[in-house]
């Protein structure tokens, strides 16, 4: 192990000098420095980001640099940060370095570990099969279905329900498919991570899930790399065990934000809106590793915070380019009490074609969108002149559109404790069948309110009966 000395510390960025004759560590190598706090030796990991010349490197700290001083000895490990992988990670919670943070026992020293930096699968390793991943959430399965091995973006501003939707997806995949999930918390609230952990523990889902956190209070180095840690764990299940894995990243915007913080400290010129000039490259390196291979698949569902609800911001716009499906959450729908607040017209998926979902599903989805689009166009007339100015056909269409809009809402298992209503999982065939009947006018006489927050159409009829219909 070659060793050097700290020459400069600027927040999370640490310069280390190895001397002009010494062997310099490679880019992305992990360096270790020990600091003494009240007589206790604490290990801090640094990652090499730049080679400055004259035997010096610039590194990013994965932990707080409080207590570090100039002149401290730094050791080169000779390899990248590596994290535990395999069955032992299930039910556990880690940080970016693969250290256990759930209070349980540490991993054995000889536990299998993989480096967090690796190349994306080659072209001939990729799988081209298109298969829909059934989520049991009506609005998603009908209008913007997810593909196995695809990338899904959950777009929405603050507080519209991205994290709750992710929790429900983890629940449904574990309960209905028995699949493995890896949850990666990137720069989000520690409280939410804690709540998610206990909720998953209570529901028994945790046994099929590995959790990795680099939350808001962590230095930017940890927030920038924690997504790679989660991805490395997911890749092992795909490549070695041949599994179909779900990778949840909450929130991909914080990944970009952390990169932006680090970029300025590394001395790079900022790009558009102050973001790092390497934004597209960093996003590409992460996203290209998330894919289906001939061995298995990693399907990723990424919550994407949209700053000030501006979709042209470079961070969400860069993420858009990599996605197969988008689920757009709309604040207007939360104000109407429709949960999940998924915008049925703005959400999209490349899986919504007759070749992938089938002719009937495609036609029902197109008709649902047509009815909702027409209703949207008529809303101005209704607001100014009232319903009486509409033709009889338009009145029928508005009634159906409102029933469809409410029927796209659904009670979630993970929200039972707040709503007092049991959650519902609706198979995709049932979803298509029920919406087809609504479009045919079979339920035109059923009160609109009966369609709110229910599962299949039978729940609507039961609710209507209890309302005295």
UniProtKB/Swiss-Prot annotation:
The record's top EC class is translocase
- E.C. number, please? 7.1.2.2
One Pfam family here? ATP-synt_ab_N
Under the GO molecular function aspect, what terms does this record hold?
ATP binding; ATP hydrolysis activity; proton-transporting ATP synthase activity, rotational mechanism
NCBIfam families found in the cross-reference section: atpD (TIGR01039)
Q: How does it assemble?
A: F-type ATPases have 2 components, CF(1) - the catalytic core - and CF(0) - the membrane proton channel. CF(1) has five subunits: alpha(3), beta(3), gamma(1), delta(1), epsilon(1). CF(0) has three main subunits: a(1), b(2) and c(9-12). The alpha and beta chains form an alternating ring which encloses part of the gamma chain. CF(1) is attached to CF(0) by a central stalk formed by the gamma and epsilon chains, while a peripheral stalk is formed by the delta and b chains.
**Protein family:** Belongs to the ATPase alpha/beta chains family.
What's the protein here called?
Answer: ATP synthase subunit beta
- The source organism is Lactococcus lactis subsp. lactis (strain IL1403)
